[in-house]
Every structure is written in structure tokens, then in C-alpha cells.
From Swiss-Prot:
This is Uncharacterized protein YteA. Gene3D superfamilies: DksA, coiled-coil domain. Residues 133-158 have a biased composition (Acidic residues). Keywords: Metal-binding, Zinc, Zinc-finger. It comes from the Bacteria. GO terms for molecular function: zinc ion binding. Residues 133-182 are annotated as: Disordered.
Length: 239
């Protein structure tokens, strides 16, 4: 059973902590959460000329302020709950077992409402977020005769890589002539079946075949010359 001196000592601690929290809220305007982000918080009139990455520090500080404000609000709520329990004469009684909470525990944690063995256990999860898991067991299936995956990890990477990567010609063992050739398997056909479909076109009626000069067309001609043929789908005999 808590003595009057012990109870008064704990009450004074709770009231002083409550006063400190309210003063902090007043001094820092609730961690500046009442200020508009990002303009009022870091003085910029506009964010149009700033890359989103340039606001990473400000965003991190904003997120931290939100977490600190939430922590202080929860602490303040626990303090008010304990002060109300003192008024009701139930302070120092475990809300689970109904037994008295030792003074030593209350002195260390004045907002304690249960015995140590009944306190909530905050277990930190060791599970990693789903985006860190490997989406496929194998990166590509091109070399596997038994598996013909229509869409594998390589395709996923290429879909993202088309928006750009950090590679430069100096990083390559055989530097390409064009930045368009920096991507993985840049020479493979995309959106067509035959390699010549990259540089030919027809009009709306399917007639008037046009050949466009391009790197793909040059490579196609070189391959035909190396093989000594005129087409990849069967040789053509000149009249």
C-alpha cells in the first residue's frame, strides 16, 4: 500500500511531466506540425523548381516530427489517466490482477497500470517487407529447354530499365556507340517477331512498303552478308 508521501511524490512527478510536455507543445508548435509542409516549414515559396529528391531531408524531418508528436500525445494521455486514477483512489492497483503495484515500479514508471508480468510486450518483427523478397528463383529461362516462361525476371527488369539506368559507356567492356544500346539485350526484338520489322512499314492499306535506314537495318544487312543469303526466311534467286 502506498503511503501518503509516496503517493504525493508520484503525483508531483506526473504533474511536472505533464507541464513539461505542454510547454514543449507550446514552444515548438506541436513540433511545427501546424505549419504547412513544405512551404512554411523550410521557407520555399514554391517546390516546382525542386527535384523531389531534394526534399528528402525535409520529408524525413517531417515524418520524425509526426512520430515525436504522436509519442508525446500518448505519454500525455497515460499521465492524465494516472492522475485520474489518483483522484479515484485506484492508482497503484494492477488493472489486470487487482494486486498492488510495487512502489519501485511506479517510481521508475509513474504511468504503469499493471504489474510487470502483465505489461504489454512490444515484440519487434523480424519479417522483412515483401519488396525485399526475390520475385523469381531464376533470373532468366532462355537457356532452359524445359521451361519457356513468357514473362520472367529479366522481362521485369527490362520494363523498369527502359526508364533509364546508371550505366555509362565507360562501365562497359565493349562500349556501345549509342546510349540506346546500353540496356540489357538492347539488340533483341521488342514489339515484333522478325528483326526486319524494326525498320519496315506499310501504309494503311498494307501496301507501299517503306524501308527506314537505321542501326537495326545495318545490322540486318551485315548478318545477311555474313551468311551469304538475301533473307532470313529463305533465299531469293536473282533473275
Amino acid at each position: 500500500m502506498l503511503t501518503k508521501e509516496q503517493l504525493q511524490h508520484l503525483k508531483n512527478e506526473l504533474e511536472q511531466t505533464k507541464k513539461d510536455i505542454l510547454n514543449r507543445f507550446k514552444d515548438n508548435d506541436h513540433f511545427q506540425l501546424n505549419s504547412a509542409f513544405p512551404y512554411d516549414s523550410w521557407g520555399e515559396l514554391s517546390a516546382y523548381d525542386n527535384h523531389p529528391g531534394d526534399q528528402a531531408t525535409e520529408l524525413y524531418e517531417r515524418e520524425k516530427d509526426i512520430a515525436l508528436d504522436l509519442h508525446e500525445r500518448e505519454h500525455l494521455r497515460d499521465i492524465e489517466h494516472s492522475l485520474k486514477a489518483i483522484e479515484n483512489g485506484t492508482y497503484g492497483i494492477c488493472e489486470v490482477s487487482g494486486k498492488e503495484i510495487p512502489f519501485e515500479r511506479l517510481e521508475a514508471l509513474p504511468t504503469a497500470t499493471t504489474l510487470a508480468e502483465y505489461s504489454s510486450q512490444d515484440v519487434v518483427s523480424k519479417d522483412r517487407p515483401i519488396e525485399e523478397e526475390t520475385p523469381f528463383g531464376q533470373f532468366e529461362f532462355d537457356d532452359d529447354e524445359e521451361i519457356r516462361a513468357p514473362y520472367d525476371s529479366e522481362d521485369s527488369y527490362q520494363d523498369v530499365e527502359k526508364y533509364g539506368n546508371s550505366q555509362t559507356p565507360q562501365d562497359m567492356e565493349n562500349p556501345p556507340l549509342s546510349y540506346d544500346d546500353m540496356t540489357m539485350n538492347a539488340e533483341e526484338n521488342i514489339g515484333n517477331t522478325e528483326s526486319y520489322e524494326n525498320f519496315i512499314a506499310t501504309d494503311i492499306t498494307g501496301k507501299e512498303i517503306t524501308v527506314y535506314q537505321s542501326r537495326a537495318h545495318e545490322r540486318y544487312e551485315e548478318e545477311l552478308d555474313e551468311e551469304g543469303i538475301m533473307t532470313t526466311f529463305g533465299d531469293l534467286h536473282a533473275d
